[in-house]
Amino acid sequence: VIEGDQETTNDAQKIQSTGCKVIQINTGTGCHLDAAMIERGIQELQPPLDSVLMIENVGNLVCPALFDLGEQTKVVILSVTEGEDKPMKYPHIFRLSDVMILTKIDLLPYLQFDVEKCIDYAKKVNPHIRVYQVSATTGAGLDDWYGFLSYHITSPSFKNTLESPSTYDR
């Protein structure tokens, strides 16, 4: 995992505690990772050729959308606490993403958040975006997300990074 934040190693430490190799990249006043940072991170991590590299960019919905990091699949993560209109407010990241993960769904009983409206907004911006609703607290929806990852990782086309991620489908 390459973990990007402006400051701290908090998230990298949490990831590392699971046994996963992680490199922290702090951008200081910068609002995103760039390809050169990813290249340096990969050189430091030295992942095996058949491994999966996950990149968590700096946590905003504007700057990271503007930079190609060479990823095969782009995933945008949206918490239900942020409001269902985020895909309309920040369309560029949703337009470029292959997947939207809607998180913290265990909080829905306590919020005024319209899941269907959020998904509709995301689909208006990007009709091909796949949506997974998950809760890290309860585990709800994680099997579907893991299934997506497993399918793509074991797919022969996974080895071909030139193939568009939108061409594979379960």
Go through each PLM region and give its residues:
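Conserved C-terminal guanine-recognition region of P-loop GTPase G domains, centered on the G4
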Residues: N60-T73, I77-I129
